[in-house]
């Protein structure tokens, strides 16, 4: 439908010059690579034609000519002439003007300045969601358009950057190529990114084109929404707010629950609180206590927390409810902005209620002092008090006052117009507007017209013009064809000369469509979850189409992520908009006049009000389990077919909700097309299940699994609900152990949620599938869903790994016996044993790159475990010439995520700190700086200036002696401690600078000064840890003492001849040994390095990592560098595995460098024997684990737990106190972590910690595993008591609860720890079971 709207703004600026019967009209703006059209009208009755010379010229500010175009034209009497100029592509900013000179005796000279517009392209960004969780993928599209909303031919690529909330560059595409004006890509958000508002920006030729934000946060997508609105308009005299609360699922059905309403007044203090039960809709009255307003209206904050019945899911809505002093408002409606002295002026006072309805019966006195007008009157049924005022010739201003009997007061001033004539012309639309159909306009003038000229303007230029001769009539029917060139918006201007004055009128045409008439529709508005939906598209053949669909619930966060019709209008207006001035219509139209003294321009062309005109507007069927619960989907690109249409069939997700579907299209010729508004459809079933399952449970506990049934069929039915025992993972309490399913029946009335539950125990650890099916009407209506909950061990898991490494340069045969160390007190049935054969040293590491360490990684140093190993793996894969592209891609993607994570810890001075808001650390900045520099060769996102600034900060921290001392908290004593002359930290910083070629050159003096300090300290270094790092630094520097240092280091080592192992027995043996191995590699002592490598390999964890982050970093680095020298490309060997009375064989060749072989071993196995024969390289790994109760640990921390009385069965308050037990007085631990695990059924909210001690503050709190575990980080701990209180809430029913535990440990020396168990309420089965589930004793 096309709409015609009268407007005061003309977005195409034009100029008019009229003289000697000549009218010259043209755009005032010029752009590069765009047509410029001038229209000259000859209404001179004396001359049959005029000859003119047109000159378009421009120069830069320094006088350099950039444009000089001339044209000779003639214009015949009573005709128009359209002259086109093509602006060059390379037009630049400057001073431009157009000159019109008469020729061949015709005296005429006019010139006008033109304004150069540099903006010739614009951009849009579409994101698939407004908000993302850590670990999500952000899909986005960039759309680039020219002034005609088409893909710009000259722009082939754009520069796209994504930044985190601290403006760190996380990802960039320096040459993002456009296809049909579109660039599409995605960003994998890291699992622990910086939360907050992120930014996508697009640049073209160094200037920002467009940007858009999205949010990264932890959130749960609500299944329902709550609306809070006044039941009646609140007035001060009511002294109350009456609210209506509506709660509906996104698919339209009402929600049952409890609404908690809180009213705040005066500095946001809680004044009133009420609760009410709501089923879909409810009302509540909140009364004030002497509420007095200072203004005519005041916002009152109201908070509504709606808790869904049965599930306890909660939606919180905070609203500002406006209270008014009076029941109505008033506006002055004028026939024109200004009045004409001596002529009647019509206006009206429009009274409306605050809901927009007319306010009739409002009485009061109207006074207009300037014309001595006074009356007492009442508003009519339309809320109007109509006035006709008679200003005299001398009236300068009308001051209109209204005083109501209830004290309401209003006034407004109206100014007179500076008039030059009483004549006017008017343009009115008289027909609907349709593409390629005639538009009918009525042109009316107060004088008989001999001619008038019309101009059609769109997209910054005049696209049509005409010279009409009405034969001296005051009215004329103008008919114009609505062409595609006018789309999407155009303006029509008419002008004539009446009484030596140019009078004019204009109209805006808003087509409400685009030249690319793209359309999108679906075959059903309601569809069952998981079923297929058909999309029908029509548009220009071959055009690009971008589709997106997302859960309507996401709009509760924001809706700016998507593209809408209104966005396209804003882009179009952005090219052509100018400022409005309601009192200077020529200014608003972009007009200026060039006339002789006897031809004037009318300054008031609005004689009547400009009102908008709207014209012409089966039984036994296979049950599908719902498992796909995406929040956004259908992010897809397609092309329109040759026929101009395209159909697409897609499967909708399994979520029961409402969806928004949007689509746009781009054609190179016809430009952009987009649907008018998003298509909304609902995935709903007449009968369905909603689950409310816990995140995790412990094995052996009795747990209630809660479901809710909904019936929308209009009648009550008996439902059969079946819970399945999938893979024998589940035990139904009170039922035979052999049952594979359990069915219950329940009556389900229409439109009411009916709860049903099952009491179960989990038999096996790991992920347990919960599969449930419900049916009514003998199976004609069914629903089924499957979800996974985690089954945790009742004891602590004890992982173990025995590794044997072999490297045969020639054919050999060797046997490796392995005895398993399984504790005799291990829980029965908990032992798992696996044999792995890896022909590649890093196969296990690559497999576990995304979870190398089992401990938390919530600080700036620990977080690097998500970054550095990926670099080492990529180095290794490239060094051995791996062709496994999927492994390279995995490591590269994880490297990008690790980079994202690490940027959270960057400080404003360029350094990196342990926490997000803290001082920079010398140790960590050195570590991050050198790692980032190395990573640049694999990801281009890293900002070189950022790395340089970090290393500059590092260099600035050097002591005049050459040493480096710690800055920031001490959390790694061996590295940061200053008791041994800072040798370790100084060596570490030098190592970072030496491994960075740019820093090595830039900070050569710093390096030289540091190496001098190390060489001066060399004689006194008697700690193997210090010496290992110093030796590696000397190797990197090529120092003259490097060989002496290595020999001294070797002398400090320990040798296990039976295992062919060499290591250094310090407080940090893995780091020390790894640095030593790096020095062996640098010295090319590969044979001597094999025993060192053997020992390191045998210290690895199951994931291929080492106990802590620094162990892992330097350990993997050393093994990688060594492995690069021992290529598996010559592998050709056979492996025989013997255990008990069984044997397995493996044949390995050089083609299998990335293949892992494994065998599950019976749990009662105590020893294995492995024989290897052949040539090559490999790792033999026996991975096993068992569960052990938490008893008899030797505590190195004091740990105290106290359960506090809350007076509620649903709230747990646990006071935790911990302190370090030093072996020497006043010594402190390294970084200390406290992990609190909660009993099954309990979870924490977002801010669970209170009452913490201040002496040694908590640096970070991390909520894990769905709120069932909380980790607290301390810089370190001493003998002081470090206390806090944790609050958790029971959300699920669990009986036979296993004890929970709290553990505190030193992060860099996990042998220093303490652990305590605690228990909460002793619920038994009889307290939580339904009658039919309860055992006989209940």
From Swiss-Prot:
Signal peptide span per the entry? Answer: 1-21
Q: Where in the cell is it found?
A: Secreted
- From the UniProt record, which GO molecular function terms apply? endopeptidase inhibitor activity
Q: Which SMART domains match?
A: A2M, A2M_N_2, A2M_recep, Thiol-ester_cl
InterPro entries attached here?
A: A-macroglobulin_rcpt-bd, A-macroglobulin_rcpt-bd_sf, A2M/Complement_sys, A2M_N_BRD, A2M_TED, Alpha-macroglob_thiol-ester_cl, Alpha-macroglobulin_TED, Ig-like_fold
Sorted alphabetically, which PROSITE patterns does this protein's record hold? ALPHA_2_MACROGLOBULIN (PS00477)
Q: Which GO terms describe its cellular component?
A: extracellular space
Q: How is it modified after translation?
A: In the hemolymph, the full-length protein is cleaved by an unknow protease into a 75kDa N-terminal (TEP1-N) chain and an 80kDa C-terminal (TEP1-C) chain which remain non-covalently linked. The TEP1-C chain contains the thioester bond which covalently binds to the pathogen surface. Cleavage is induced by bacterial infection or aseptic wound injury. During embryonic and pupal development, the cleaved form is the predominant form.
What does the UniProt entry report for the null mutant?
Answer: In RNAi-mediated knockdown females infected with parasite P.berghei, causes an increase in the number of parasite oocysts in the midgut and a loss of ookinete melanization.
Cysteine disulfide links: 1217-1283, 1326-1338, 1329-1334
Q: Which UniProt keywords apply?
A: Disulfide bond, Glycoprotein, Immunity, Secreted, Signal, Thioester bond
Assembly and interaction partners: Heterodimer of a TEP1-N chain and an TEP1-C chain non-covalently linked. Forms a complex composed of TEP1-N and TEP1-C heterodimer, LRIM1 and APL1C; the interaction stabilizes TEP1-N and TEP1-C heterodimer, prevents its binding to tissues while circulating in the hemolymph and protects the thioester bond from hydrolysis. Mature TEP1 and to a lesser extent full-length TEP1 interact with SPCLIP1; the interaction is induced by microbial infection.
Descriptive protein name: Thioester-containing protein 1 allele R1
């Amino acid at each position: 439908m096309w709409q015609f709207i009268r407007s005061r703004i003309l977005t195409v600026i034009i100029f008019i010059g009229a003289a000697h019967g000549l009218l010259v009209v043209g755009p005032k703006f010029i752009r590069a690579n765009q047509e410029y059209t001038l229209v000259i009208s000859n209404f001179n009755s004396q001359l049959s034609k005029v000859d003119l010379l047109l000159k378009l010229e421009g120069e830069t500010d320094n006088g350099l000519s950039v444009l000089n175009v001339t044209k000779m034209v003639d214009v015949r009497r009573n005709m128009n002439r359209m002259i086109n100029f093509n602006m060059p592509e390379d037009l630049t900013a400057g001073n431009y003007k157009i000159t019109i000179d008469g020729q061949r005796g015709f005296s005429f000279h006019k010139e006008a300045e033109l304004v150069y517009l540099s903006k010739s392209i614009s951009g849009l960004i579409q994101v698939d969601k407004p908000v993302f969780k850590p670990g999500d993928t952000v899909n986005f599209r960039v759309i680039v358009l020219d002034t005609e909303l088409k893909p710009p031919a000259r722009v082939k690529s754009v520069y796209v950057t994504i930044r985190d909330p601290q403006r760190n560059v996380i990802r960039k595409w320096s040459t993002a190529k456009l296809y049909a004006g579109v660039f599409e890509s995605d960003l994998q958000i890291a699992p622990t990114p910086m939360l907050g508002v992120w930014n996508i920006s697009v640049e073209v030729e160094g200037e920002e084109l467009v940007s858009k934000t999205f949010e990264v946060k932890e959130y749960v997508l609500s299944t329902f929404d709550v609306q809070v609105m006044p039941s009646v308009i609140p007035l001060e005299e009511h002294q109350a707010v009456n609210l209506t609360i509506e709660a509906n699922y996104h698919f339209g059905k009402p929600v049952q629950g409890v609404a908690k309403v809180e009213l705040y007044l005066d500095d946001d203090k809680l004044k009133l609180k009420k609760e009410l039960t709501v089923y879909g809709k409810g009302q509540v009255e909140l009364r004030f206590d002497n509420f007095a307003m200072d203004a005519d209206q005041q916002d009152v904050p109201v908070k509504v927390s709606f808790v869904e019945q049965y599930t306890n899911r909660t939606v919180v809505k905070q609203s500002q409810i406006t209270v008014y002093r009076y029941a109505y408002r008033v506006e002055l409606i004028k026939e024109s902005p200004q009045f004409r002295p001596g002529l009647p002026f019509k206006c009206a006072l429009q009274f409306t209620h605050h809901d927009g309805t007319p306010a009739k019966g409002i009485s009061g006195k109207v006074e207009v002092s300037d014309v001595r007008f006074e009356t007492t009157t009442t508003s009519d049924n339309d809320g109007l008090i109509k006035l006709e005022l008679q200003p005299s010739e001398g009236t300068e201003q009308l001051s209109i006052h209204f005083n109501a009997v209830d004290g309401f007061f209003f006034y407004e001033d109206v100014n007179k117009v500076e008039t030059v004539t009483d004549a006017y012309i008017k343009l009115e639309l008289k027909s609907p507007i349709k593409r390629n159909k005639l538009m009918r306009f009525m042109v009316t003038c107060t004088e008989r017209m001999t001619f008038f000229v019309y101009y059609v303007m769109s997209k910054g230029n005049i696209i049509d013009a005409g010279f009409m001769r009405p034969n001296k009539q005051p009215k004329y029917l103008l008919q114009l064809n609505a062409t595609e060139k006018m789309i999407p918006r155009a303006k029509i201007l008419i002008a004539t000369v009446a009484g030596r004055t140019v009078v004019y009128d204009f109209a805006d045409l808003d087509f409400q469509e685009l030249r690319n008439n793209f359309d999108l529709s679906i075959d059903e508005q309601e569809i069952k979850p998981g079923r297929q939906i058909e999309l029908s598209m029509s548009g220009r053949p071959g055009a690009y189409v971008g589709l997106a669909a997302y859960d309507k619930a996401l709009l509760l966060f924001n809706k700016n992520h998507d593209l809408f019709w209104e966005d396209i209008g804003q882009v179009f207006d952005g090219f052509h908009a100018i400022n409005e001035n309601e009192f200077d219509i020529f200014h608003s139209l972009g007009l200026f006049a060039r006339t002789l003294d006897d031809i004037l321009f009318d300054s008031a062309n609005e004689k009547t009000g400009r009102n908008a005109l709207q014209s012409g507007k089966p039984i036994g069927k296979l049950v599908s389990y719902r498992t796909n619960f995406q929040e956004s989907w259908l992010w897809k690109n397609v092309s329109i077919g040759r026929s101009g249409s395209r159909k697409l069939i897609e499967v909708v997700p399994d979520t029961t909700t409402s969806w928004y579907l949007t689509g746009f299209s781009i054609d190179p010729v016809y430009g952009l097309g987009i649907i008018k508004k998003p298509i909304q459809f609902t995935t709903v079933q007449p009968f369905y299940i909603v689950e409310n399952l816990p995140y995790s449970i412990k094995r052996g506990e009795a747990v209630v699994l809660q479901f809710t049934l909904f019936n929308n069929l209009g009648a009550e039915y008996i439902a059969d609900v079946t819970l399945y025992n999938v893979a024998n993972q589940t035990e139904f309490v009170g039922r035979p152990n052999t049952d594979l399913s359990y069915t219950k029946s329940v009556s389900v009335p229409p439109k009411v949620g009916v709860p049903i539950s099952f009491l179960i125990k989990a038999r096996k650890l790991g992920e347990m599938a919960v599969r449930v099916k419900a049916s009514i009407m003998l199976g004609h209506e069914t629903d089924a869903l499957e979800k996974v909950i985690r089954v945790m061990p009742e004891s602590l898991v004890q992982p173990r790994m025995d590794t044997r490494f072999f490297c045969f340069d020639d054919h050999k045969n060797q046997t490796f016996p392995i005895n398993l160390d399984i504790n005799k007190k291990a829980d029965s049935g908990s032992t798992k044993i696996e044999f792995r054969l890896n022909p590649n040293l890093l196969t296990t590491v690559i497999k576990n790159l995304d979870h190398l360490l089992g401990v938390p990684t919530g600080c700036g140093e620990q977080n690097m475990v998500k970054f550095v190993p990926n670099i080492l793996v990529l180095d290794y894969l490239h060094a051995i010439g791996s062709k496994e592209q999927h492994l390279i891609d995995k490591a590269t993607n994880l490297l990008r995520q690790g980079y994202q994570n690490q940027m959270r810890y960057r400080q404003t001075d360029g350094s990196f700190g342990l926490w997000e808001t803290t001082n920079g650390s010398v140790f960590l900045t050195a570590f991050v700086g050198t790692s980032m520099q190395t990573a640049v060769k694999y990801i281009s996102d890293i900002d070189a200036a950022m790395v340089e600034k970090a290393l500059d900060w590092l260099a600035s921290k050097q002591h005049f002696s050459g040493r480096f001392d710690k800055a920031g908290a001490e959390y790694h004593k061996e590295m940061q401690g200053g008791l041994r002359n800072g040798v370790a930290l100084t060596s570490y910083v030098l190592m970072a600078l030496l491994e960075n070629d740019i820093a090595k050159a830039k900070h050569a003096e710093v390096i030289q000064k540091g190496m001098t300090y190390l060489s001066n300290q060399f004689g006194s270094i008697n700690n193997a840890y210090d010496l290992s790092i110093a030796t590696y630094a000397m190797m990197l520097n090529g120092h003259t003492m490097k060989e002496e240092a290595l020999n001294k280091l070797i002398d400090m080592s320990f040798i296990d001849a039976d295992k062919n192992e060499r290591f250094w027995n310090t407080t940090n043996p893995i780091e020390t040994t790894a640095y030593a191995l790096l020095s062996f590699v640098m010295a090319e002592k590969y044979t001597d390095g094999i025993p060192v490598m053997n020992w390191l390999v045998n210290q690895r964890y199951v994931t291929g990592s080492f106990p802590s982050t620094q162990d892992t970093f330097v350990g993997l680095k050393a093994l990688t560098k060594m492995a690069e020298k021992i290529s598996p490309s010559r592998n050709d060997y056979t492996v025989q595995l013997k255990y008990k009375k069984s044997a397995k064989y493996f044949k390995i060749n050089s083609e299998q460098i990335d293949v892992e072989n494994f065998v599950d071993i019976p749990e009662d196995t105590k020893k294995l024997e492995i024989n290897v024969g052949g040539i090559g390289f490999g790792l033999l790994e026996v991975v096993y684990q068992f569960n052990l109760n938490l008893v008899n640990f030797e505590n190195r921390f004091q740990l105290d737990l106290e359960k506090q009385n809350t007076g509620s069965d649903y709230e747990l308050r646990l006071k935790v106190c911990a302190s370090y037990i030093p072996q020497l007085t006043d010594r402190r631990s390294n970084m200390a972590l406290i992990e609190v695990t909660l009993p099954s059924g309990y979870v924490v909210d977002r801010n669970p910690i209170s009452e913490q001690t201040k002496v040694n503050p908590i640096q970070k709190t991390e909520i894990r595993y769905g709120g069932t575990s909380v980790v607290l980080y301390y810089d370190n701990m001493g003998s002081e008591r470090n206390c806090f209180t944790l609050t958790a809430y029971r959300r699920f029913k669990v009986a036979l609860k296993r004890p929970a535990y709290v553990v505190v440990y030193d992060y860099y020396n996990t042998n220093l720890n303490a652990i305590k168990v605690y228990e909460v309420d002793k619920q038994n089965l009889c307290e939580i079971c339904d009658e039919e589930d309860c055992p006989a004793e209940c």
